[in-house]
């Protein structure tokens, strides 16, 4: 790693090693996400990163939330922290001089353009709203007093930016399916490929369908997730469950709604340019 006196990183090389356990499982995608989050919120003119998955004698475990993202961000944040200590400069100042912006560059190491970044504005507002600077000084004074008096209790405060990728690294996984049935009594049965695990996904997708048909939520009935109904589903992960399954349900609902509108016009004795809807029907 090379950096200037003001803390700007001019070039960096990072090698990641992960404990893959005795079988591969999801170690590959986890490493991919770690590699694509090594930049976090920072632009680097010269950047090289490589990841190795190590086969070990430990039991393999599947991935959980974060999926490599926090590990990648932790690596670069640790590097910036070391630069801050070496130069005796405030960590947030070292971060700020490396942020994605027009001067430093807006393209990630993997070629994606960082558009409409409001990072500096958001951080400034958070710092002001939280009184971060004054609280930092108070804590610093407290810790110095504790050290002076030989006491072990310490306090801490931190503020760290984060850039996290939404959706899957593999494009083919960014898809979903839904099955919508409308019955003679006006009730709607909905199947989709998402998994409800307490995050409220089912109610969100049901709200999408109710909105599309213009009916109240109690008209929509959800069936449990079942791959015999909706095959080839992607995992409910990568902060994509609502977007993918919600849009699949919306598209399916629009197809049926358009058919219903055409049928209303076809069965009418007079020409209707715009069907009149009562309670969404």
Per-region residue spans from a language model:
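Alpha-helical support elements that line or immediately flank enzyme active sites
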Residues: 29-34, 63-93, 98, 167, ...
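Glycine-rich loop/linker segments at domain edges
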Residues: 1-78, 165-175
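Short acidic, glycine/proline-rich loop/turn micro-motifs
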Residues: 26, 106-109, 192-193, 232-237
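Acidic, glycine-rich active-site loops and adjacent beta-strand->loop/helix elements
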Residues: 16-21, 48, 100-103, 163-165, ...
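Helix-loop-helix junctions that connect adjacent transmembrane helices in secondary transporters/permeases
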Residues: 99-187
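Single conserved hydrophobic/aromatic residue that forms the stacking wall/gate
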Residues: 270-281
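Short, surface-exposed charged micro-motifs
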Residues: 41, 177-181, 212
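Flexible glycine/proline-rich, aromatic-decorated loop/lid segments
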Residues: 50-52, 217-241
């Amino acid at each position: 790693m090379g950096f200037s006196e003001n803390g700007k990183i001019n070039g960096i090389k990072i090698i990641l090693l992960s404990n893959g356990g005795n079988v591969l499982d999801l170690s590959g995608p986890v490493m991919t996400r770690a590699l694509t989050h090594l930049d976090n919120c920072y632009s680097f003119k010269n950047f090289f990163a490589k990841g190795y998955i190590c086969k070990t004698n430990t039991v393999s475990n599947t991935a959980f939330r974060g999926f490599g993202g926090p590990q990648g961000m932790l690596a670069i944040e640790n590097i910036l922290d070391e630069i801050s200590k070496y130069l005796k400069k405030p960590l947030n100042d070292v971060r700020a001089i490396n942020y994605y912006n027009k001067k430093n560059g807006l393209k990630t190491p993997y070629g994606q353009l960082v558009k409409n970044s409001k990072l500096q504005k958001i951080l400034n507002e958070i710092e002001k709203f939280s009184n971060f600077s004054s609280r930092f000084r108070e804590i610093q004074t407290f810790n110095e007093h504790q050290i002076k008096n030989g006491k072990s209790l310490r306090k801490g405060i931190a503020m760290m930016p984060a850039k996290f990728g939404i959706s899957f690294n593999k494009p083919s996984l960014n898809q979903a399916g839904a099955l919508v049935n409308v019955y003679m009594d006006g009730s709607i049965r909905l199947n989709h490929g998402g998994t409800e695990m307490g995050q409220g996904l089912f109610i969100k997708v049901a709200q999408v369908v109710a909105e599309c048909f213009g009916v109240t939520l109690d008209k929509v009935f959800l069936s449990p997730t079942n791959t015999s109904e909706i095959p080839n589903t992607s995992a409910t992960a990568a902060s994509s469950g609502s977007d993918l399954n919600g849009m699949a349900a919306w598209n399916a609902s629009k197809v049926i709604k358009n058919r219903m509108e055409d049928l209303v016009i076809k069965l009418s004795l007079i020409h209707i340019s715009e069907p009149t809807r009562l309670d969404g029907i």
